[in-house]
Amino acid sequence: MKLHTLRPAKGSVKTSKRIGRGTGSGRGGTSTKGHKGAKSRSGYSSKIGFEGGQMPLQRRLPKFGFKPLNKIEFKPINLDELLELIEKTGASVIDTALMNQNGLIGKNDKVKVLARGEVKSIKAEIIAHAFSASASEAITNAGGKVTLIG
């Protein structure tokens, strides 16, 4: 095999359509664009969503939804998770930094403590952005302290 005998595989290379090269080529005249209309002109591009004068889909469908700009999203943490954290670390103060170090929350998450799980005694101060009423009651009844972050 020599370099000058190399050929591409059969069927792998197609010859391009040579349009607009006279009527004898079979692709002359209108150059495969049909007769008249905007689509046959140079520089044509349709508007996105234009349906030829029919009412476009984005205008036929109703508007929906609303996203409040000042909504605060809390990461829920339950009492049973906090009890596990207290057992694991033995800390007397549970704050967002400790929760972050142990993978319960992300760095910038706001925390709301919820009341899932039974609490017999908590000898710790729990610092969070929000507490459910039942969670704060359960913590204070079990001997713990609840502190809100502003």
Curated annotation (Swiss-Prot):
Cellular compartments per GO CC: cytosolic large ribosomal subunit
Keyword entries, A-Z: Ribonucleoprotein, Ribosomal protein, RNA-binding, rRNA-binding
Biased composition (Gly residues): 21-31
GO BP: translation
Alphabetical list of Pfam families matching this protein: Ribosomal_L27A
Keyword RNA-binding annotated: yes
Superkingdom in the source lineage: Bacteria
Region entry Disordered, spans: 1-51
GO MF annotation terms: rRNA binding; structural constituent of ribosome
Gene3D superfamilies in the cross-refs: 3.100.10.10
Family stated for the protein in its record: Belongs to the universal ribosomal protein uL15 family.
Subunit-structure text: Part of the 50S ribosomal subunit.
General function of this protein: Binds to the 23S rRNA.
Name assigned to this protein: Large ribosomal subunit protein uL15
Species annotation: Cytophaga hutchinsonii (strain ATCC 33406 / DSM 1761 / CIP 103989 / NBRC 15051 / NCIMB 9469 / D465)
Origin organism lineage: Bacteria, Pseudomonadati, Bacteroidota, Cytophagia, Cytophagales
